[in-house]
Each structure stands twice: as C-alpha cells, then as structure tokens.
Amino acid sequence: MVNQKIQLICETESAVQFTALCQQKGLIHDPDSYLALVQTKVEGQVRLELRKLDEPKLGAVYVDFVTGTMAHRRKYGGGRGEAVAKAVGIKGNYLPTVIDATAGLGRDAFVLAALGCKVRLVERHPIVHLLLQDGLKRAYADVEIGTMMQANMQLLDIAHIQELNSSEEGADVVYLDPMYPHKQKSALVKKEMRIFQHLIGADLDADMLLEPALLLAQKRAVVKRPDYADFLAKKTPHFSHQTKNHRFDIYLKT
C-alpha cells in the first residue's frame, strides 16, 4: 500500500524524525483528510496517535503495552485460560512459536508474548504498522516488561506473510484476525474499530491469507472470526473454540 493520504500533524519538537517516518511508509499529508496521524507528547513520552478529527469525542487510537488495558490484562487477565491462548494450543510446558499475520494493534500477540510465546508480527497497513512500531519501541524501553517484550515480540518489516519462506521462516502457529464488517450500528462499535474501519475498511482479500498461513504453519493455523462470519475462504476448520462474540477456527497441519 503506497502513498496513503492522511493529515500528518506533529505536536512535538522532533518534526524531522516524524517526517522521515511518514516518508518511509509513503504517507502524504492531505489537509482535507478527517483522519490524522499525530505525533504528540503525553506525560513526557512521545507517541503516535490516530485521530478522527470530525469525531473528536472518539479520542485517539494508539498502541500502549505498558499501562492501561493491556497492563491490566497482563496482570489480572485470564492468562493461559484466555481464548487466544487455548486456540494456539498452549498447554503444560508447550509454548508455540507464533506468526500473527494480521497484527493490528498487537493485543492478541501481546497476550501470547506475556505468556512466553515467541511472536512475530506482520501488519501490512503502513499507518497501523507505524502505530505498532511506536508502541513496541516504548514497550522495549520499559523497566518492567522491556526484556520480555524484546525477547518475545518482533514486528517484521514486511507487508504480507507471502514474503516469508515457508521452509525456513515458518512457526508452530500462524494466527489470522482479518478485519470484518461489523453488524452493529456504528455507535455501538468500539472507537478503535470505528476509526480503523474508516482507515482500512474490511479485509476484502482476507480469503487469500489462509493458504499461505497453512504453508507457514508447522502445526496449526488459527483464524479469529466474529461469531456470525463465514469460515475464511469457505474452508471448514478441523474444530472451533467459541467465545461470547467470536469464534476461533483451527486448521491442523495433517
């Protein structure tokens, strides 16, 4: 994806660094866009945010593994009982290596990394990639989780898992969570999803991810879907884990 138009706003002194980052990803400043990528400073820390300027009440979308929701989930969440942990097959001493092929904001990957899995992340949208890269940079520098994050979460500088060599760069598990149109009225959808849908839309070519995922996966491919969605690529999984709103479809390597 090249030459993505979006408002580029720098609220810090390091405008040169911000401009270089944006140029690297082919981003072009569009003063008429209602979506903005913003470099700002909060409590002394520089971070990247995505804002929907025509709906300021939505707030900003950014990646934060250190504080807030993700810190709470790491400390007090379900741990190995989390649905994503069960879906990838964590059991006893077994901690699979994982490729998260549709990393997004990195939340499911973070749950797995915090449990001890080595997770490589792929994110093809340049703006989301920058948000994720920014969040990881701050997490790597954190006193409490920095060492674990550097060891267990790595963002690859590629846009698609097809760029990986299946014989040398595979993993035990390849995890897919493609964007899917929401059924609910937009007001009921979480702010991240509302902003993301304006930025990305649904992954209309998501069906094309399953085959390369199965090539890279040494043990299983896992696909997270809304409970009302069809199977990816209309391919029936070996089995599924059902949660309140989602379904994890598991495709075993046979």
Curated annotation (Swiss-Prot):
Cysteine pairings via disulfide bonds: none
Entries under InterPro entries matching the protein: 16SrRNA_methylTrfase_J, SAM-dependent_MTases_sf
GO molecular function, one term: rRNA (guanine-N2-)-methyltransferase activity
Main EC class the enzyme belongs to: transferase
EC identifiers of the protein: 2.1.1.242
Record-listed S-adenosyl-L-methionine binding positions: R107, D108, E123, R124, D177
Subcellular localization: Cytoplasm
Gene Ontology, cellular component aspect: cytoplasm
Matches recorded under Pfam families: SAM_MT
Functional note: Specifically methylates the guanosine in position 1516 of 16S rRNA.
Name of the protein in its database record: Ribosomal RNA small subunit methyltransferase J
Source organism (scientific name): Histophilus somni (strain 129Pt)
